[in-house]
Amino acid sequence: MSRLQIQLKLAASRIEILRQKEEALAKQARRNVALGLKSYSPALAKARIEPLIMQDIYIELLELLQVDVEILANRCVVLEKRAFNDSMSFKSSLYHVMAAAPQLQIKELRFVHDFLVKLYGKEFARLSDPDLATNDTAFYQLLYPPIPKDELVEAYRKELIRTYFPNDYPKEANKDIPSSAEADTMLNLESSENREQPTSLKEENTQEDDEKVNGNLANISKRAEPQNNGSTNASSLQSSNYLPTNPTLTHSNKAPSFEELAARLDRLKHL
């Protein structure tokens, strides 16, 4: 194992320790700021939240550098043979390390930077200049983060409230959402009880009622009329109370009225 590879592995371990330390500090800082958000003024809350955002960006930068350093440690043989060129698949990792080494207080990274500059020459040092090496804009935004915008600060504040005060978050997040009754009023919706039935449904209900009445009348007439046998005369049927006593109805071919059918039904009940 060469000296360059040893320094790269030590740099990866140092970055991991530094990242874990920053994560613990950021967690404590977020908790302290979240507990004071209810009493802070908007300007003070913004001033307290901006450092938290910058710290999160720094942690993300350390995570990226840790991966890049481990990749370079596995490709150390190529670097030492001066076989590196722009067509290498790990060139972005080398650019990241060369640009971040002068900005971070990690001596192992500084050693890797100085070693590669001496090995490849002074032209290789231009990779550490963000104005000249513009191959990865997203990385340089992590290395030189801009001032957080107001929208980002407000979103971070809401996230803190949601994390540390979950009972207060729904009230703030859903304050503009109307209730179900208000939504019905806004949409002019009628309840199912007050809603008028369509005309076709009314006609169907009326037709069903008429059919039920006609069916009841037919049943009454069947129960009231006698069974006509050839050997049965009118006198025997009248004596057995199957026919009415009114002689005008005995030989009538007309259909009985509703009152007549009702009278027959009453007589049948008394049998």
From Swiss-Prot:
Alphabetized UniProt keyword annotations: Cytoplasm, Endosome, Golgi apparatus, Nucleus
Cross-referenced Pfam families: Ist1
Domain of life: Eukaryota
Bias kind Basic and acidic residues: ranges: 192-205
InterPro entries hit by this protein: Ist1 (IPR005061), IST1-like (IPR042277)
GO cellular component: cytosol; endosome; Golgi apparatus; mitotic spindle pole body attachment site; nucleus
Family matches, as Gene3D superfamilies: Vacuolar protein sorting-associated protein Ist1 (1.20.1260.60)
Positions of the UniProt region annotated as Disordered: 189-255
Keyword Cytoplasm belongs to the record: yes
GO biological process, one term: protein transport to vacuole involved in ubiquitin-dependent protein catabolic process via the multivesicular body sorting pathway
Subcellular location: Cytoplasm; Nucleus; Golgi apparatus; Endosome
Polar residues biased stretches: 226-255
Family per record: Belongs to the IST1 family.
Entry function: Involved in a late step in sorting of cargo proteins of the multivesicular body (MVB) for incorporation into intralumenal vesicles. The lumenal sequestrated membrane proteins are targeted into the vacuole after fusion of the endosome with the vacuole.
PANTHER family: IST1 FAMILY MEMBER (PTHR12161), IST1 HOMOLOG (PTHR12161:SF5)
Protein name: Vacuolar protein sorting-associated protein ist1
Organism from which the protein derives: Schizosaccharomyces pombe (strain 972 / ATCC 24843)
Biological classification of the source: Eukaryota, Fungi, Dikarya, Ascomycota, Taphrinomycotina
Gene this protein is translated from: ist1
